[in-house]
């Protein structure tokens, strides 16, 4: 199977979005984020999203010329994304929030009217590379994406909500936690479907509440749903989902998943903490590296190796950037149908 190079795929993606009416700069930003996700091993937020984003744009769910407005009050930034590309909005906001954090110990940004922002790791890593800690909470206020069951339920009422944490590690890679509070991200389940694979046990249920490992059950007329994170302790993942809905849906005024507003996108809540305003940075890094070394010395099973959150993505990205990546037949076919390749 053919392997595709990093810069080539970014060029193809930039051309696709530019061709449908997005400016060159924004087209490249979106393309870089999506391609980087696949090269980090997260296809659920990678190449498969090109065709999805194109359709959203053509269905007028995204406004490439939507005005992004910001209001800064002390250490808080209030953002209206103007229904613009979510990746463009989030990228712009995180960069400006980093600048704002140079003046404040802790600062935050609340974003509404923002389309899908892609992989959280893209944003939480930036402050982490600049001596800062970042927290991120994202909800989806699209009532059509209610695919996650509340604890003990069998009916999709919630959406897969991610939570993120980025922090300097003292190594070439930042510590990064980017997880969804459902058993699996919806996009990851789509990956299994595209590759004709069975899901791990007890990730989704059918409309009768019975466990199934058939990913198609989430998308066909059977009205399947994803279980909350945690397995038999799923009440914990469910509780985190409620927390994220409150912060990213309520506090930002984006709206909760039950509000039928005929919109599609994300409510986003970013927090950046300037480490140097709390503790000497070198001391923080020294102690953090010592902690990481302590974790890495854990005894393991044969051929296993303890890694820290964010380390696998860094290693895989460097490997894939050198060698290129393969694209599944289903995603490749979808990309060819929209004339992605140049």
Question: At which residue positions do the language-model features occur?
Answer:
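Acidic, glycine/proline-rich low-complexity segments that act as flexible tails and inter-domain linkers
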Residues: 1-4, 12-29, 35, 43-61, ...
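Catalytic-core signal marking the mid-to-C-terminal active-site face
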Residues: 4, 9, 19, 246, ...
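Active-site cofactor/substrate anionic-group-binding motifs, chiefly glycine-
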Residues: 46-98
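A generic, well-ordered mixed alpha/beta core segment in the N-terminal half of proteins
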Residues: 77-170, 179
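Glycine-rich phosphate/pyrophosphate-binding loops
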Residues: 131-147, 244-262
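Phosphate/diphosphate-binding glycine-rich loops and adjacent basic-rich segments that engage nucleotide
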Residues: 143-218
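Secondary-shell segments that build the walls of catalytic and ion/ligand-binding clefts
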Residues: 194-258
């Amino acid at each position: 199977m053919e392997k595709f190079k990093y810069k080539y795929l970014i060029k193809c993606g930039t051309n696709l979005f530019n061709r449908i009416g997005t400016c060159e700069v924004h087209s490249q930003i979106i393309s870089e984020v999506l391609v980087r996700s696949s090269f980090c091993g997260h296809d659920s937020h990678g190449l498969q999203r090109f065709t999805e984003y194109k359709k959203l744009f053509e269905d007028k769910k995204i406004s490439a010329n939507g005005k992004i407005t910001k209001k800064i009050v002390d250490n808080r930034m209030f953002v209206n994304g103007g229904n613009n590309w979510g990746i463009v909005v989030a990228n712009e906001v995180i960069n400006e929030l980093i600048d704002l954090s140079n003046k404040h110990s802790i600062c935050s940004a609340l974003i509404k009217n923002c389309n899908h922002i892609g992989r959280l790791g893209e944003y939480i890593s930036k402050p982490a590379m600049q001596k800062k800690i970042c927290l991120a909470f994202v909800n989806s206020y699209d009532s059509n994406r209610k695919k996650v069951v509340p604890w003990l339920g069998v009916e999709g009422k919630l959406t897969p909500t991610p939570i993120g944490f980025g922090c300097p590690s003292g190594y070439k890679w930042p510590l990064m936690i980017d997880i969804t509070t459902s058993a699996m991200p919806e996009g990851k389940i789509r990956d299994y479907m595209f590759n004709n694979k069975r899901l791990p046990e007890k990730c989704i249920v059918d409309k009768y509440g019975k466990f199934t490992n058939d990913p198609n059950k989430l998308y066909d007329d059977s009205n399947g749903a994803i279980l909350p994170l945690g397995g038999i302790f799923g009440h914990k993942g469910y509780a985190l989902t409620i927390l994220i809905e409150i912060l990213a849906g309520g506090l930002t005024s984006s709206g909760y998943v039950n509000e039928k507003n005929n919109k599609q996108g994300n409510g986003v809540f970013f927090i950046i903490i300037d480490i140097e305003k709390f503790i000497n940075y070198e001391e923080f890094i020294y102690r953090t590296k010592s902690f990481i070394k302590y974790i890495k010395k854990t005894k393991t099973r044969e051929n296993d190796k303890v890694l820290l959150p964010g380390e696998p993505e860094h290693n895989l990205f460097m490997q894939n950037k050198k060698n290129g990546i393969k694209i599944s037949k289903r995603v490749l076919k979808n990309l060819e149908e929209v004339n992605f390749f140049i």
